[in-house]
């Protein structure tokens, strides 16, 4: 009876899993991630490596602020997990995944070097992406549409310091929560959702960048920058924000049928990683 239940669960699970030799992967047409901030203590590199392990795609788009050069210039921090993310990304590119890196503001020094290839990875300022159902999306990091970045870059760097301070506090909070058996919680995200000025800033950013896409006759826009994942319609434009791998650990994916979705790895991993022991038994 127990074995039968396991088999039923396995069959249901396989509806969303692609078989490839002895491994099982979540398979997508394209994956978009942004704001990883390698080189900072807030970066969730271990979770990103786990996400890499369980996903495969034809395309992988790195939508800016993957390497945080701002922070590395101030204080060098580069643990093994951060190096592993770079190596795994390069490995994906070598093994057939088309990987493209859209430059952001924390890695803006790369803009001076364009055209630039990093191994098999092409680095660009922006690009146009066409989905399976022929919809055209402008893909950018998004800092060019941030009023603070555009008119007061020094203020944005002060904000970056304050943000890192919040992340440091969050490490302590989540250590305690894990001890109590509770899920991770983001102080910075909580404040973004509650503080009136932060909510207004995010709303203005979203409208500004969506309006640009509309003027250029795109069906939608894919971006990052503000660390707030979203999939919404703004005046006829599909606004898609990848989120980040500091607080929310989210990614934007295009399914094989052309459907666009924001996935939260902390939630999805419970469905994937929990099956690993059984998958190993089945594959023997």
What function would you assign to each model-found segment?
Residues 272-284:
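C-terminal regulatory/interaction regions
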Residues 24-30, 129-138, 233-238:
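Beta-strand-turn-beta hairpins that frame and shape the catalytic cleft
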Residues 23-29, 40-131:
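Core catalytic region of metal-dependent phosphoesterases/phosphodiesterases
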Residues 119-125, 143, 148-157, 199, ...:
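Conserved beta-sheet core of the metallophosphoesterase superfamily
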Residues 15-42, 174-195, 278:
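Mobile, glycine- and charge-enriched loop segments
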Residues 33-34, 61-64, 100-105, 139-140, ...:
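Active-site neighborhood of phospho(di)ester-bond hydrolases with catalytic His/Asp-centered motifs
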Residues 1-13:
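N-terminal amphipathic/basic-hydrophobic helices that include classical n-h-c signal peptides
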Residues 142-205:
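Active-site-proximal loop/helix segment associated with metal-binding centers of metalloenzymes
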């Amino acid at each position: 009876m127990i074995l039968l239940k396991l088999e039923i669960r396995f069959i249901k699970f396989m509806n969303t899993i692609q078989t490839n030799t002895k491994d099982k992967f979540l398979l997508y047409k394209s994956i978009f991630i942004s704001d990883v901030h390698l080189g900072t203590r807030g970066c969730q590199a271990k979770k990103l490596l786990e996400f890499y392990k369980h996903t495969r795609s034809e395309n992988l788009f790195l939508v800016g602020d993957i390497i945080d050069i701002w922070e590395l210039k101030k204080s060098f921090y580069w643990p093994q997990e951060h190096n592993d993310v770079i190596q795994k990304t390069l490995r994906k590119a070598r093994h057939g995944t088309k990987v493209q890196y859209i430059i952001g503001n924390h890695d803006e020094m790369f803009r001076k070097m364009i055209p630039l290839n990093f191994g098999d990875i092409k680095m660009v300022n922006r690009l146009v992406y066409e989905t399976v159902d022929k919809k055209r999306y402008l893909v950018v990091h998004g800092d060019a549409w941030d009023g603070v970045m555009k008119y007061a870059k020094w203020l944005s760097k002060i904000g970056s310091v304050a943000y890192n301070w919040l992340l440091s506090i969050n490490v302590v909070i989540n250590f305690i929560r894990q001890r109590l058996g509770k899920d991770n919680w983001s102080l910075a995200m909580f404040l973004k959702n509650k503080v009136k000025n932060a909510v207004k800033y995010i709303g203005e950013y979203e409208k500004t960048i969506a309006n640009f896409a509309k003027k250029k006759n795109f069906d939608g826009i894919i971006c990052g920058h503000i660390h707030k994942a979203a999939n919404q319609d703004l005046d006829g434009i599909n606004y898609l924000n990848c989120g980040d791998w500091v607080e929310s650990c989210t990614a934007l994916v295009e399914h094989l049928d052309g459907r666009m979705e924001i996935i939260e790895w902390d939630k999805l991993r419970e469905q994937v990683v929990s099956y690993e022991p059984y998958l190993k038994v089945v594959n023997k």
